[in-house]
Amino acid sequence: MNSLKIEGTTFTPEINFDIENNTLTFLKVSKPANAIEFYKPLFDFIDNFEKVKVKSKITKELVIDFKFTYFNTATAKVLYELLGKFKKITEQGVDVVVNWYYPSDDDDLLEEGAELLEEDKA
């Protein structure tokens, strides 16, 4: 299984799912015209990751780093779905660590991240 790398644009984030290190990183802006379509390759990759590395007990930990500078409402909805997938992965014995990074002067992004992660725990 190879890693997944999606190059960022002005409207979409760089996404790097590094299989060797079991890390998933989101960088910069996420305001794609169609968030569901943009994130579909990542959803498919996570499904395959679960089949190959999680169910075979190869992976014990996954670290997710959100390093957005901005994301829109459509992206937030997709992120809720993604976090739901990761919740299922934790139920299979994988420790999923989620880190939320934000610019020190951006309280809005801090609050949005806190809300997103709090909703996932519900």
Regions found by a protein language model. Name each.
Residues 1-18:
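Short beta-strand/loop segment at the start of cytosolic alpha/beta domains
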Residues 22-28:
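Short, aliphatic-rich beta-strand segments
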Residues 28-30, 103-104:
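Structural motif
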Residues 37, 42, 59-116:
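Amphipathic alpha-helical interaction surfaces in cytosolic regulatory modules
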Residues 118-122:
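Short, intrinsically disordered, charge-balanced linker/junction segments flanking boundaries
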Residues 31-59:
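A short, well-ordered alpha-helical element
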Residues 16-18, 34, 106:
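Poly-acidic low-complexity segments
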